Structure formats: structure tokens, C-alpha cells
């Protein structure tokens, strides 16, 4: 199809065209996208639909200044924050819409889809906005406008999720390359209630059985599991490659955060030795809700062929993401990880242990401190938030 490059660019800024996957040629190698397998010779339309349906968060400009006097664009520094938003958004899509949900332009979508989008708008009163993430990053030692690594973004999402009552996600970020099954089940089976910092300091947090909106005990909060890893010193150790790629085959896969130094991507799959990613390095204008309360969603879906890079060119600092909707889903994840991914490694990518290591400090599930606002509104200072648990966390990889 003949096209004018200038007009194509203008269309992309305002209303992207649905493009062919010319960048992904026919191959005997299957393509895996977040737990789904495709044949490029026969499944290109389905593959295209799957990739386009992922929520795509990029640099934005002309939003209200962060903190009132800070930057009004995240161009140049917010790429890892945007990748973290994409991973979390995929978890929320799986939770509310299901992995098989597909986006179509100009089609009415479920109300939950709009609710998910509104969690990530570039406004200070949206739970996972660039404003909230940047300001929560201050508590992780990152100045507003400073580049984040994958582990720092994971820690920020874990803390912001405590203010997100609609999704009620349990966010677990592994430490010391170890995933502790017992700790995850403790966190997912109980829902924290707001407590004072004095109570948290004395480990007297108030907990109650997780309940759904009807008041019945649901028994399990949906789990966002993030595993920060360093898969080498300066480059990825080839011994980890097969296990890393195998994680994208799992039905619980949320992909991975990573990329190159100061240049983050959201990895969603692979084909052969090529790893496929969504790229946040496009600056688009801030989008707000319309009068009807809906969000114009065209610019939140990447309607062009996917990007890819050689897996060995990936920076070794990454964070794998997984979503487990219920306890059976998590048990299945544990079984596959142990028997099919970690067991066959000469050097294990990370450890999965059933019990809390006795030499570790006691596991204290995170609770939301008392704040003067509701939800995630106006988290202006994080100096005193969560300082109790910080001593137990590894905050850099």
C-alpha cells in the first residue's frame, strides 16, 4: 500500500493506522506473546490483534507539572515508568477482561476497560499516573526526573497498589533472587486495612479476610508477582537465555521490564533468538477524560509492527512479571517454574522456596499507612511511608 510518510506520521500522532506486521516475516519459528503461541505463516491476523490489544504507554507532554512545579513531560526519563505501567495494565486486563480479550478501534468495550485506562492517566489523582510513580520514587531514593531501574519501578508499583482499592492486587516483589511461596500465600489470603505507622512499627498490623464487594470471603487477592533479576555482569549469561524465554510461554506471563542502560522496553514475547517488545520512546500529547467520562484510547494501542532485538543484546538487569488470578493459578505457576524452567538449569535463574528462610527477618505483609486523603489522591510526600519495611528489601539490582 503506497503512503506518504508525512501524512502517515500525522495520522499516527492523532489516529494511528492499523498496519501490517511486515517487520515479522514468515518463519518456521513460533512466536510467543504473553503465554500465547502463534505461527507467523497462518496466524498473522491473530498475532497482530493480540499485540495491538496490549495497552501501550509512552512518553507524554503537556500534563500538569509533577508536584506542582516539576516537569510537565517525562520525555527522556520516564521510559521505565511507562514500561512498569504497561506490565501492571496487562495484569489488570487479565484480572477484569481476561487474557483473550481483544481491542478494536471504534468499538464499545466493557466499562472495566475504561476504568483500567483511567488508572494510568497523567493526572495526580490517578492511582498509577506518572505523577504518583515519580513521587513515590522519591521514597526509593530517586529524584523526580531521574531514570528508574526495573527493580525500583517494581517497588513503586507495590507501594501504590496499597492505595488501589478497586483492583485489590497483592503485589509481591522477590528479594535476593528468591520467591517464597509461603509469604505469597500469606499476602494473598489476607487484605490489609489502614494502620498507623506506630502499629506497623510494632508489627501489630490489622488484617481481615479478603472479601469481595458482596461481603463474601473470596480467599485470594489476585497476585502480581515481580521477580527482579541480574542475569549476568555486563551482558546476559547465555546459560539463562532458555529459561528467560520459557517464562514468556507461561499462561501467567506478564512479560519483562528491561532493555538497555537508560533505555527501557516492555518485553512481551519472543521468536527464536529475537525478543519482542513495546517501545515507550514516542512522545504523545497528554490525554484526559472527555465530558462523558471516557478516554480517547487510540494512542494507548501501538498499531504498527512490533519491535525486536537479539536476546543476548539485552541488559542483564531485568524484572519478570506474572499474574495469578487465584490460588490454583499460582500453584500451577509454581509447578511449571520448578519442574520445567528452573530444574533443567545448570545455573538457576532464581530460587523458588516453599518456606520463609529462617535467617531472614519475619515476613510482614505491607499495609497502607494512614494518610489524610482517600485512595491514591495527592501522595505528596513519601518520606515517612514504608520506612519500616525498607530495611528488609533490596532496592537496587
Curated annotation (Swiss-Prot):
Reactions accelerated catalytically: [protein]-C-terminal L-amino acid-glycyl-phosphatidylethanolamide + H2O = [protein]-C-terminal L-amino acid-glycine + a 1,2-diacyl-sn-glycero-3-phosphoethanolamine
Main enzyme class: hydrolase
Primary subcellular site in the record, as a coarse category: cytoplasm
A Pfam entry, by short name: Peptidase_C54
UniProt-annotated location(s): Cytoplasm
Family statement drawn from the similarity comment of this UniProt entry: Belongs to the peptidase C54 family.
Protein name: Cysteine protease ATG4A
Organism: Xenopus laevis (African clawed frog)
Amino acid at each position: 500500500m503506497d503512503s506518504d510518510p508525512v501524512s502517515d506520521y500525522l495520522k499516527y500522532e492523532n489516529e494511528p493506522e492499523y498496519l501490517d506486521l511486515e517487520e515479522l516475516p514468515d518463519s518456521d519459528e513460533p512466536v510467543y506473546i504473553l503465554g500465547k503461541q502463534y505461527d507467523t505463516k497462518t496466524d498473522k491476523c491473530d498475532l497482530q490483534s493480540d499485540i495491538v490489544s496490549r495497552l501501550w504507554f509512552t512518553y507524554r507532554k503537556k500534563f500538569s507539572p509533577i508536584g506542582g512545579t516539576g516537569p510537565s513531560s517525562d520525555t527522556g526519563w520516564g521510559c521505565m515508568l511507562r514500561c512498569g505501567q504497561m506490565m501492571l495494565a496487562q495484569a489488570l486486563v487479565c484480572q477484569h477482561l481476561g487474557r483473550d480479550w481483544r481491542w478494536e478501534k471504534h468499538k464499545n468495550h466493557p466499562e472495566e476497560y475504561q476504568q483500567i485506562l483511567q488508572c494510568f492517566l497523567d493526572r495526580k489523582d490517578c492511582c498509577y499516573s506518572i505523577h504518583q510513580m515519580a513521587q513515590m520514587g522519591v521514597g526509593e531514593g530517586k529524584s523526580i526526573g531521574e531514570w528508574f531501574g526495573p527493580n525500583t519501578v517494581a517497588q513503586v508499583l507495590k507501594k501504590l497498589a496499597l492505595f488501589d482499592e478497586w483492583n485489590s492486587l497483592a503485589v509481591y516483589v522477590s528479594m535476593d533472587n528468591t520467591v517464597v511461596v509461603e509469604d505469597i500465600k500469606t499476602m494473598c489470603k489476607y487484605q490489609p486495612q489502614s494502620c498507623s505507622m506506630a502499629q506497623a512499627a510494632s508489627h501489630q498490623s490489622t488484617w481481615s479476610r479478603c472479601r469481595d464487594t458482596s461481603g463474601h470471603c473470596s480467599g485470594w487477592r489476585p497476585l502480581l508477582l515481580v521477580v527482579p533479576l541480574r542475569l549476568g555482569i555486563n551482558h546476559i549469561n547465555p546459560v539463562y537465555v532458555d529459561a528467560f524465554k520459557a517464562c514468556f510461554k507461561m499462561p501467567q506471563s506478564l512479560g519483562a521490564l528491561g532493555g538497555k542502560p537508560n533505555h527501557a522496553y516492555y518485553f512481551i514475547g519472543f521468536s527464536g533468538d529475537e525478543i519482542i517488545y513495546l517501545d515507550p520512546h514516542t512522545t504523545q500529547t497528554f490525554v484526559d477524560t472527555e465530558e462523558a467520562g471516557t478516554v480517547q484510547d487510540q494512542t494507548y494501542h501501538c498499531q504498527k509492527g512490533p519491535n525486536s532485538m537479539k536476546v543476548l543484546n539485552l541488559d542483564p538487569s531485568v524484572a519478570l512479571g506474572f499474574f495469578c488470578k487465584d490460588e490454583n493459578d499460582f500453584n500451577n505457576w509454581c509447578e511449571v517454574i520448578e519442574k520445567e524452567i528452573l530444574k533443567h538449569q545448570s545455573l538457576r535463574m532464581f530460587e523458588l522456596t516453599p518456606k520463609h528462610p529462617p535467617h531472614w527477618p519475619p515476613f510482614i505483609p505491607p499495609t497502607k499507612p494512614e494518610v489524610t486523603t482517600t485512595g491514591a489522591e495527592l501522595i505528596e510526600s513519601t518520606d515517612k511511608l514504608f520506612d519500616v519495611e525498607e530495611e528488609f528489601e533490596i532496592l537496587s539490582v
